[in-house]
Regions:
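Beta/coil-rich, acidic/histidine-enriched accessory regions frequently appended to metallopeptidases
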Residues: 1-35, 41-44, 52-56, 67-71, ...
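Sequence contexts marking disulfide-bonded cysteines in secreted/extracellular proteins
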Residues: 37-42, 93-98, 171-173
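Acidic/histidine-rich, surface-exposed loop or edge segments in extracytoplasmic proteins
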Residues: 44-62, 113-115
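Structural motif
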Residues: 57, 93, 119-121
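Auxiliary, metal-adjacent structural segments of Zn-dependent hydrolase domains
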Residues: 61-113
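Short pre-active-site segment immediately N-terminal to the catalytic Zn-binding motif
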Residues: 112-129, 140-146
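Acidic/His/Gly-enriched intrinsically disordered linker/tail segments
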Residues: 127, 141-242
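Short active-site segment of divalent metal-dependent hydrolases/proteases
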Residues: 133, 137
């Protein structure tokens, strides 16, 4: 009996060591994943449910973060007619904070489609709602695939980003009849070489939405994708207006 217990103890200890090693490797290799799992471990404090920021922020900066989150949530909720996701937000108002949690030069990023990190340059409703849209879309897709250009173009549309969309009418600032990047790796390469890739993607999505019932049409499209219909069967690029 004692020998059997010893074997179980050794096995349990080995599992504990392996799990600890996995946590350490994740924290070193993927700090953003670790930070979104344990914001407090990276020096962030909870400002409100689901929102974390640097400790000791003055009241006006805390209020700024809260207002940005509220406005961004409203944009996503209004577009989709509700929410199916509730990502944690890690908000940094200093570059040191953003580097510490694994951020780079981006304004913001959705981490594993379950959390959002915002850099000091991304603490505004446009960037926050852009990243929240990625999380919301994938929560509604239930594992269905969409081209990365659609994912990004929809995020621009929902966030109403004036850098890449006109305010009214045919909202395209930059049309492109060329194929757009399909995979995430292709998108990252293309967008780093051409920042206007976002405008090209947003043009396609906004024109499709304009020709297919707007927000309701997009919600219907996402529902059909979630039900298993392939993307090429439900999304047909509209012609440019005459």
């Amino acid at each position: 009996v004692s020998r059997r217990r010893r074997r179980w103890w050794i096995a349990g200890a080995a599992v504990a060591v392996l799990l600890t090693a996995a946590v350490v490797v994740t924290a070193i290799a993927f700090p953003s994943v670790a930070a979104t799992t344990c914001p407090g471990c990276y020096g962030l404090e909870r400002l409100e449910p689901g929102v974390y920021a640097e400790p000791g922020l003055p009241q006006d900066r805390r209020r700024q973060v809260s207002e940005v989150v509220q406005q961004a949530n409203k944009r996503v909720r209004d577009f989709f007619g509700g929410r199916k996701s509730s990502p944690d937000l890690l908000v940094c108002l200093s570059d040191d904070c953003y580097r510490r949690i694994g951020g780079g030069r981006e304004r913001g990023i959705a981490v594993l489609n379950r959390a959002v990190m915002l850099s000091p340059r991304g603490v505004d409703p446009v960037i926050a709602s852009h990243e929240m849209t990625h999380v919301e879309l994938h929560a509604r897709l239930n594992g269905a695939d969409v081209p990365q250009w659609f994912d990004e173009g929809l995020a621009v549309l929902v966030s109403d980003d004036p850098r890449y969309l006109a305010p009214t009418g045919d909202r395209c600032l930059l049309d492109s009849r060329q194929p757009l990047p399909v995979t995430l790796a292709e998108w990252l390469r293309a967008a780093s070489a051409d920042p206007q890739m976002y405008a090209k993607a947003a043009c396609q999505v906004s024109r499709w939405a304009g020709a297919n019932g707007g927000k309701e049409g997009v919600r219907t499209l996402v529902g059909r994708l979630s039900a298993g219909q392939p993307f090429p069967d439900v999304f047909h690029p509209p012609a440019a207006p005459a």
